[in-house]
């Protein structure tokens, strides 16, 4: 058997199961980086009004790539069946995973709030200085950095996951430090941004009906206000589902002290869910933009 010898999971993966999960991480990483990269280039080449209309959406895609940034280390370690990059590498992967994940969730919150401003406070949004976007984006990354740094400073800690092929918050040590970290993070960096973001989107969606058709036509771009608002809502719903696996493992471990007894399968499902959710974002954008692109004339002479 392979995995973390310090863990006593109910089921430990065989060599072939590690090969299979390593291949999944490798494919997911390639798919997310390829699709998000193409989507970022596509959006960056547009000339919308206001000019920074797609700025936060682009950073949503950048943070989706960051969530998958550890896939090469995760995939190679899974294929071998053990962590390959030592204790320093473990701390770096834990930090990067939390930085990417928390920044991604907060960037979704910023995208939802931008949709609310774009629909419900149109005049201010149209004249909003570019520096506001820089401040908002920087603040979202600051929140991600804060939560990723705390385990390095002693509020909880990073360690090997139950399958022993990647590192994240050490849920096998459910002490008071871990419990307080998990509960504060769940409330202030998951429940709050997701619920607040959904409320903002619901207000924006209601406000769309008040925009005159002439204004909608004038503001029409590769992605309309309706499409962007629908994207923001879909992104939050996808994230609520795709990050629920990590939420379950973290809360379960905090309440039951059973993190060390998780099976290898239950240890792999949360990261696969979150990474798969990130792959859906650029697909939805391409689907909507494909419907907005002008159709070529295919009539025969």
From Swiss-Prot:
Q: Which InterPro entries match?
A: GPCR_opsins, GPCR_Rhodpsn, GPCR_Rhodpsn_7TM, Retinal_BS
**Topological domains, Cytoplasmic:** 44-54, 121-132, 209-230, 290-301
Q: Which family does it belong to?
A: Belongs to the G-protein coupled receptor 1 family. Opsin subfamily.
Q: In which tissues is it expressed?
A: Mainly stored in myeloid bodies of the inner segments.
Q: Which residues carry this modification: N6-(retinylidene)lysine?
A: 275
- Attached carbohydrates are found at 170
Q: List the disulfide bonds.
A: none
What protein is this chain from? Retinochrome
Role: Retinochrome is capable of acting as an effective catalyst in the light to convert various isomers of retinal into 11-cis, the form that is required by opsin to resynthesize rhodopsin.
Subcellular localization, as worded in the UniProt entry: Membrane
Which PANTHER family does the protein's record reference? OPSIN
Q: Record's superkingdom?
A: Eukaryota
Cross-referenced Pfam families: 7tm_1
GO BP annotations listed = phototransduction; visual perception
Q: Which UniProt keywords apply?
A: Chromophore, G-protein coupled receptor, Glycoprotein, Membrane, Photoreceptor protein, Receptor, Retinal protein, Sensory transduction, Transducer, Transmembrane, Transmembrane helix, Vision
Q: Which GO terms describe its molecular function?
A: G protein-coupled receptor activity; photoreceptor activity
Residue spans crossing the bilayer: 18-43, 55-76, 95-120, 133-153, 181-208, 231-255, 265-289
Q: How does it sit in the membrane?
A: Multi-pass membrane protein
Q: Does the keyword Glycoprotein apply?
A: yes
| GO cellular component terms attached to this protein's record | membrane
Q: What is its main location?
A: membrane
Q: Which residues lie on this side of the membrane: Extracellular?
A: 1-17, 77-94, 154-180, 256-264
């Amino acid at each position: 058997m392979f995995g973390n010898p310090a863990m006593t999971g109910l089921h430990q993966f065989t060599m072939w199961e590690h090969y299979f999960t390593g291949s999944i991480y490798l494919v997911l990483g390639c798919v997310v980086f390829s699709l998000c990269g193409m989507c970022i280039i596509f959006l960056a080449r547009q000339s919308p009004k206001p000019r920074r209309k797609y700025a936060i959406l682009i950073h949503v895609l950048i943070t989706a790539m960051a969530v998958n940034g550890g896939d090469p280390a995760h995939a190679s370690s899974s294929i071998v069946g053990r962590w390959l990059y030592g204790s320093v590498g473990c701390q770096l992967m834990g930090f990067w995973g939390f930085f990417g994940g928390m920044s991604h969730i907060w960037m979704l919150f910023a995208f939802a709030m931008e949709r609310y401003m774009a629909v419900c406070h149109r005049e201010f949004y149209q004249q909003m200085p570019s520096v506001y976007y820089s401040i908002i984006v920087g603040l979202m990354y600051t929140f991600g950095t804060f939560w990723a740094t705390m385990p390095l400073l002693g509020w909880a800690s990073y360690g090997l996951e139950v399958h022993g092929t990647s590192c994240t918050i050490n849920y096998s040590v459910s002490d008071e430090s871990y419990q307080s970290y998990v509960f504060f993070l769940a409330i202030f960096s998951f429940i709050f941004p997701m619920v607040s973001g959904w409320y903002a989107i619901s207000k924006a969606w209601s406000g769309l009906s008040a925009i005159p058709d002439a204004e909608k036509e004038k503001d029409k771009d590769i992605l309309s206000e309706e499409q962007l608002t629908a994207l923001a809502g879909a992104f939050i719903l996808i994230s609520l589902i795709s990050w629920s696996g990590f939420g379950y493992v973290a809360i379960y471990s905090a309440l039951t002290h059973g993190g060390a007894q998780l099976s290898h399968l239950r240890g792999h499902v949360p990261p696969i869910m979150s990474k798969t959710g990130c792959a859906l974002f650029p697909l939805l954008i391409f689907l909507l933009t494909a419907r907005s692109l002008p159709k070529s004339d295919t009539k025969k002479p």
